[in-house]
Design a protein with these regions (language model features):
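GST-like domain detector, emphasizing the conserved glutathione-binding G-site
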Residues: 1-125, 131, 138, 145
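A glycine-rich, coil/turn loop motif that links secondary-structure elements
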Residues: 146-153
């Protein structure tokens, strides 16, 4: 049984999607970000930076934090959506999501939805970056059925 510590955010949804896709039994423990539950000492033991999601695989007492690492773990464990022969390409697209797509679009969301008008520089910068990212993703999907190739993978789930 997998225990998923999560909140209603894109990073949390990724793991729920993966668990559903692989047909894994799991339970969700909600982490209330509005009440700063992610910064409680017992949660920091699971996730040193106080970020969701986290899973505990109660079958082997493994605890994994960071959505990309969790997707890799679940893909490897289940044998689904993380094929050995395509692993390098899958990892490249997964890391692009973790390092560029997610953080940059997240910044755009912060400036445009939570703090509009507070930083013209931030709003313009992240709007341009987000527009470019969507353009690159569209270009990739014109040449490939899925991000990492012809098959649905954890890179698609992450993005």
């Amino acid at each position: 049984m997998i225990e998923l510590f999560s909140a209603n955010t894109p990073n949390g949804w990724k793991i729920s999607i993966m668990l559903e896709e692989i047909g894994c039994e799991y339970k969700v423990t909600k982490v209330d970000l509005g009440k700063d539950e992610q910064f409680k000492p017992e949660f920091i033991k699971l996730s040193p930076f106080g970020k969701i999601p986290v899973i505990i695989d109660h079958g082997n007492n493994e605890s994994i934090f960071e959505s990309g690492a969790i997707l890799m773990y679940l893909g490897h464990k289940s044998g689904k959506f993380y094929d050995e022969k395509d692993r390098l390409n899958i990892n490249q697209w997964l890391m692009a999501q973790m390092g560029t797509v997610g953080p940059m679009i997240g910044q755009h969301h912060q400036f445009h939805h939570y703090n509009p008008g507070k930083s013209e520089f931030g709003e313009e910068r992240y709007f341009k970056i987000t527009k470019r990212i969507y353009g690159e993703l569209d270009a990739r999907l014109k040449e490939s059925k899925f991000l990492a190739g012809p098959e649905y993978t954890i890179a698609d789930i992450a993005t």
